Curated annotation (Swiss-Prot):
GO terms for molecular function: beta-glucosidase activity. Disulfide bonds: none annotated. Glycans are attached at N40, N82, N104, N211, N263, N417, N448, N477, N482, N502, N517. Residues 1-19 form the signal peptide. Optimum pH is 6.0. This is Beta-glucosidase C. It comes from Emericella nidulans (strain FGSC A4 / ATCC 38163 / CBS 112.46 / NRRL 194 / M139). Keywords: Carbohydrate metabolism, Cellulose degradation, Glycoprotein, Glycosidase, Hydrolase, Polysaccharide degradation, Secreted, Signal. GO terms for biological process: cellulose catabolic process; glucan catabolic process. Pathway: Glycan metabolism; cellulose degradation.
Length: 618
């Protein structure tokens, strides 16, 4: 007989502390009762959760189910009704995503301490959980991640995958954990374990490439590094593994942030392979999962967004895979909004016709616990009071969310040492580790006539450059000229091709064709035919660049690196060690012909997964 996961969760909560209760004696109980149970660290976590839950009003419970972005700033109330003060003081919310650049670690730590202080002033004093999208690399997109700023700067996860070094991934995660902890961030809205089986998809830079086995191997170390020693605890940063059940196979490579990219498809009937990294994450102790916006088409599943889909969340994730942790939806499934000045409808794909109230009910019924990017607790209150959703069902999700706060130690010490933050974040050791990874992750695709490394350019050697500032060359005492006719070598840094999209938010997603247009190809060809040229192609997606490979003297691939890293590799200060984490297709025809859900399905690629040359030892 199949037992509902909701019942199992309540039974577990009621019985986990039984052993402790039996062992208790009366004097000990008297000492422990000096504080409310939920504030008393001598009680086990499940007893504290149960006690706090029993004290909460429906409105306070509803507030726990929402996870909203905020930026650094004052806590004063404002006329829009959505300030931090309103969300904490009136809407009872305690989960926030820090959605702004961090330019001063101490200042950010002080801001988060201020938020925690405000939370302690509420009736029950439930502490705040601060989360963040990735902020240790080069991506700058309010919807997906932030440039490192004051944090140590590493290659994107693709670059870590290119190095195929689980210990390095563990080291990165431990560094990121220390830097997050220093400012008060306790939740990482990553890793992204989608497989990059559709080369046009705009989210590939956040993946670990095309190989499910490699992704699984690396993700285990990633999660363990963020959690620290053992299970989730006071020195942990919890991770949110996404996007279940694997966001890679997007129809035509479009992204489901947007209405035209809402479909996810499996023409190769390869659903199971996309689940492999999630199974590895669960085995490694993942405590939170995020489904993607997409709706599956051409499958036996209902064609509705994954967070609305009970077959996905309850039957597959909780039932078949046995997950009993938190399911956090992706952002903005209920309410239409603006991101910047771009209007964004709620990503309620397949259930657009439902009201906001009905969408919230559908998400809870599917088995999700928390609504990302929303601040609508009044909907939950209405659903319970109307009898659509039981308060017992709300209690199950609230208990999961509270338990996580207790495990993280937030109830016992929500504050950080702000004065120490600047000494931890971006310290010399962490920065050097990131810089070394940037250099090592470079992949040498071609090296005709062994032009690289340019270890000792002769005095007076002149360079034509594109894609980076000449000041980096001047600092090395190299001469930069304005035309190829004057130069001895050309050094070019190019982003992987994409088709710009309209809208301030939409434009951040590199989408569409992976090939340079005819005009740009002709322009580059003139350079390649004029002088020896070294190209660095920045692979946030698998570029279609056979003409570059054929015509340039040497081609390097990178996955998030600064100009100093590029020049160190070019001039032999560092060696490229990376191997391609995906195939590089030969043509857009080949890309369009491949099945979105099958890895390594592109016909006759320019380079296969795993390609990467090495510098010869001189």
């Amino acid at each position: 007989m199949r037992v509902d996961s909701t019942v199992l969760a309540l039974v577990a909560l009621a019985t986990d502390c039984l052993g402790l209760a039996i062992k208790s004696n009366e004097p000990e109980l008297l000492r422990r009762d000096a504080l409310p149970i939920y504030k008393n660290a001598s009680y086990c976590v499940d007893e504290r959760v149960r006690d706090l839950l029993s004290r909460m009003t429906l409105e306070e419970k509803a507030g726990q189910l929402f996870h909203k972005q905020l930026s650094e700033g004052p806590l004063d109330d404002d006329s829009s009704g959505n300030s931090t003060e309103t969300m904490i003081g009136k809407k009872h919310m305690t989960h926030f995503n820090l959605a702004s650049d961090i330019t001063n670690a101490t200042q950010t730590a002080e801001f988060i301490n201020l938020i925690q202080k405000r939370a302690l002033q509420t009736r029950l004093g439930i502490p705040i959980t601060i989360s963040t999208d990735p902020r240790h690399s080069f991506t700058e997109n309010v919807g997906t991640g932030f440039q490192a700023g004051v944090f140590s700067q590493w290659p994107e996860s693709l670059g870590l995958a290119a190095l195929r070094d689980p210990q390095l991934v563990r080291e990165f995660a431990e560094v990121a954990r220390e830097e997050y902890l220093a400012v008060g961030i306790r939740a990482a809205l990553h890793p992204q374990v989608d497989l990059s089986t559709e080369p046009r998809w705009a989210r590939i830079s956040g993946t670990w490439g095309e190989n499910s086995t490699l992704t699984s191997e690396l993700i285990v170390e990633y999660i363990k590094g963020f959690q620290g020693e053992g299970k989730l605890g006071p020195k942990s940063v919890k991770t949110v593994t996404k996007h279940f059940p694997g966001g890679g196979p997007m129809e035509n490579g479009e992204d489901s942030h947007f209405y035209y990219g809402k479909n996810q498809t499996y023409p190769g009937n390869n659903i199971d392979e996309h689940l492999i990294p999630f199974k590895a994450a669960l085995a490694a102790g993942a405590t939170e999962i995020m489904p993607y916006y997409s709706r599956p088409i051409g499958t036996n599943w209902e064609a509705v967004g994954f967070s609305f889909n009970k077959e996905i969340v309850t039957d597959l994730l909780r039932g078949e895979l046995g997950f009993d942790g938190i399911v956090l939806t992706d952002w903005g499934l209920i309410t239409d909004t603006y991101i910047g000045n771009q209007y964004m409808p709620a990503r309620a794909w397949g259930v657009e016709y439902l009201s906001e109230l009905q969408r919230a009910a559908r998400i809870l019924d599917a088995g999700c616990d928390q609504f990302g990017g929303e601040e609508r607790p009044e909907l939950i209150v209405q659903l319970v009071r109307e009898g659509t959703i039981s308060e017992d069902r709300i209690d199950v999700s609230v208990a999961r969310l509270l338990k996580e706060k207790f495990l993280l130690g937030l109830f016992d010490n929500p504050f950080v040492n702000a004065s120490a933050a600047n000494n931890i974040v971006g310290n010399e050791h962490f920065v050097n580790l990131g810089r070394d990874a940037q250099r090592r992750s470079y992949t040498l695709l071609t090296n005709n006539q062994t032009i690289l490394p340019l270890a000792k350019p002769g005095e007076g050697t002149r360079f034509y450059i594109e894609g980076f500032d000449s000041a980096f060359m001047s600092a090395r005492n190299y001469t930069v000229v304005n035309t190829t006719e004057e130069a001895d070598f050309a050094l070019l840094r190019y982003n992987a091709p994409y088709e710009p999209r309209n809208g301030t938010f939409e434009a951040n997603f590199h989408a569409g064709s992976l090939a340079f247009n005819a005009t740009e190809k002709a322009r580059q060809a003139k350079i390649y035919s004029s002088l020896p040229t070294i190209v660095d192609i920045i692979l946030d997606r698998p570029a279609v660049i056979p003409e570059v490979v054929e015509q340039a003297q040497a081609v390097l691939a990178s996955y998030g690196s600064d100009s100093e890293a590029f020049l160190d590799v070019v001039f032999g200060v560092s060696k490229p060690e990376g191997k391609l984490p995906f195939d590089l297709p030969r043509s857009m025809d080949a890309v369009e012909a491949q099945a979105e859900d099958l890895p390594f399905d592109t016909e006759n690629p320019v380079f296969r997964y795993g390609h990467g040359l090495e510098y010869e030892d001189n």
